Amino acid sequence: MIQVLLVTICLAAFPYQGSSIILESGNVNDYEVVYPRKVTALPEGAVQQKYEDAMQYEFKVNGEPVVLHLEKNKGLFSEDYSETHYSPDGREITTYPSVEDHCYYHGRIQNDADLTASISACNGLKGHFMLQGEMYLIEPLKLSDSEAHAVFKYENVEKEDEAPKMCGVTQNWKSYEPIKKASQSNLTPEQQRYLNAPKFVKLFLVADNIMYLKYGRSLTNVRTRMYDMANILNLIFRRMNIHVAVTDLEIWSDKDKIIVQPSADDTLKSFATWRESVLLKHKSHDNAQLLTGINFNGPTAGLAYLGGICDPMYSTAIVQDHNKIHHLVAIAMAHEMGHNLGIDHDKDTCTCAAKSCVMAGTLSCEASYLFSDCSRKEHRAFLIKNMPQCILKKPSKTDVVSPPVCGNYFVEMGEDCDCGSPATCRDPCCDAATCKLKQGAQCAEGLCCDQCRFKGAGTQCRAAMDECDMADLCTGQSADCTDRFQKNGQPCQNNNGYCYNGTCPTMIKQCTVFFGSNAAVSQDACFQFNLQGNNYGYCRKEQNTKIACEPQNVKCGRLYCTSPEKQNPCNIYYSPSNEDKGMVLPGTKCADGKACSNGQCVDVTTPY
């Protein structure tokens, strides 16, 4: 295992206290000024990272020394993370920024086992930590002396004088009673395997145009705000053994892509429809949230579909950016995601180790990151009943490209397992100090792992999802449940398609994705445009040059569709930022007994 670089930074608290100041978090009474001093002790030959994997901060609070341990939240972003914004003329601009060496951390105060700190180290230190049961905030002071920071209790932030914000959820989608009943039944082996498997939510974040205007028409300001909140969201769900990773951030910098209005119900419906018909075509993800600067009617601060996770339309939520203090908005985001994960509002009898819990119907200013006992039971019951599959997919070891850190809950190169710190680990199979399996253990996690041993060969670990899928079986030699599917070329969808890598791609299905449920495949004459070799028709590209289709391959180039809403009988989907989007998908049936492969219509009996 690669040794983690440890960086010590001393925060010397000068004997100076302020009585009142206006900070990014709002008006603050009673704060301390501290000055970070960074002390780096690099091992010989080590490469200096911009943001280290692990850091310590030493400083005084109320005259008492504290040590804050931080570890980079390496799973905050997916490996293929992208950002999208729009030019003033409406042109979509998508980039794939490097987020490997980001500046967002989780941590804890020394001698406290719980992860309770969320810190951004991008431009100074900004975030919060818990000390002796109280929340403290730290943020840079915008002074000529750039090293000055303010440390203050959360209770000393003046709260905005307005009615308490509430969640608008009133069981607005799935029936809740059957979920409760399901928790009373005995678990099947498949349900038990599902519960034991690690869970991941791949999150698509959208900021509306009012958010863009609110933060000075600055993409950087909006991005920073969203990142700060996502870091806290990730921390909150770690307590539920769910890892939230941001796959994409889209900022509506030119105009809103839906009608965002004070009616939260109407806005959620519009966003859910847009997500299903547009967003899912851009990139695969599990859940989408819209952050808006609009004021919803009444006290509503957010709305989500109860139990909607993994559904193309209903795995959505909307949240109002209702407070300057970003962690209060992050809690609202966690609350709405909790609804998507099958958790209803807490009743009066529900409790957690805080004054208020995440799923309270009224959003508290107490800033609790804890789910109640009721929430945990309801979430478990929802998982047992529905077993949503999208949240089982996790990054592979090689997806995490920075040096491994034992104790960060990610199994990385050189590690057998990672169950957190020795103080928090509850895994009987894993040695938390070394991230190696305990003596006699064969595995610690995986659908083919049971009580630290591999399940027997032939044991079903995942049921077939459709006609092109196959039930997956354990090998007896691994904890992994290897995905299997029907061989390519097998007829599917009533002979309208052929199986391809576990799916059944058809032109009609692709047309409805781009042009709606009433769309159809265009007449053959439209596909003759693929003979041109330009934006409107080609079969493949060589060194960015579009190559025209051969006559026998025209059904394997640009997809042409017709729709009642379109007068033109030959419609294509074209995006300058992603020219290949809108091409006929590989494996699609192009003639009887033939399917598309690399822009050619080939016989399904040959490998493709």
Curated annotation (Swiss-Prot):
Keywords, comma-separated and alphabetical: Apoptosis, Calcium, Cell adhesion impairing toxin, Disulfide bond, Glycoprotein, Hemostasis impairing toxin, Hydrolase, Metal-binding, Metalloprotease, Platelet aggregation inhibiting toxin, Protease, Secreted, Signal, Toxin, Zinc, Zymogen
Placement of sequence motif D/ECD-tripeptide: 467-469
Enzyme Commission number(s) from the entry: 3.4.24.-
Binding site for Zn(2+): 335, 339, 345
Any one of the GO CC terms: plasma membrane
Gene Ontology molecular function: any one: metal ion binding
Subcellular location: Secreted
Residues engaged in binding Ca(2+) 1: 405, 408, 410, 412, 415, 418
Regulation: Inhibited by EDTA and EGTA. Not inhibited by PMSF, antipain, pepstatin, and iodoacetamide.
Cofactor(s) listed in the protein's UniProt record: Zn(2+)
Enzyme class: hydrolase
Disulfide-bonded cysteines: 310-390, 350-374, 352-357, 406-435, 417-430, 419-425, 429-452, 443-449, 448-474, 461-481, 468-499, 492-504, 511-561, 526-570, 539-549, 556-596, 590-601
Glycosylation sites: 501
Domain Disintegrin: 403-488
Co-factor binding details: Binds 1 zinc ion per subunit.
Family annotation (PROSITE patterns): ADAM_MEPRO, DISINTEGRIN_1, DISINTEGRIN_2, ZINC_PROTEASE
Active site: 336
UniProt-annotated binding residues for Ca(2+) 2: 469-470, 472, 483-484
Matching InterPro entries: ADAM_Cys-rich, Disintegrin_CS, Disintegrin_dom, Disintegrin_dom_sf, MetalloPept_cat_dom_sf, Peptidase_M12B, Peptidase_M12B_N, Reprolysin_adamalysin
Transcription among keywords: no
Job description of the protein: Strongly inhibits the collagen-induced human platelet aggregation. Hydrolyzes the Aalpha-chain of fibrinogen (FGA), without cleavage of Bbeta- and gamma-chains. Induces apoptosis and strongly inhibits proliferation of endothelial cells as well as adhesion of the cells to extracellular matrix proteins.
Oligomer and partners: Homodimer; disulfide-linked.
Protein name per Swiss-Prot or TrEMBL: Zinc metalloproteinase-disintegrin-like agkihagin
Organism: Deinagkistrodon acutus
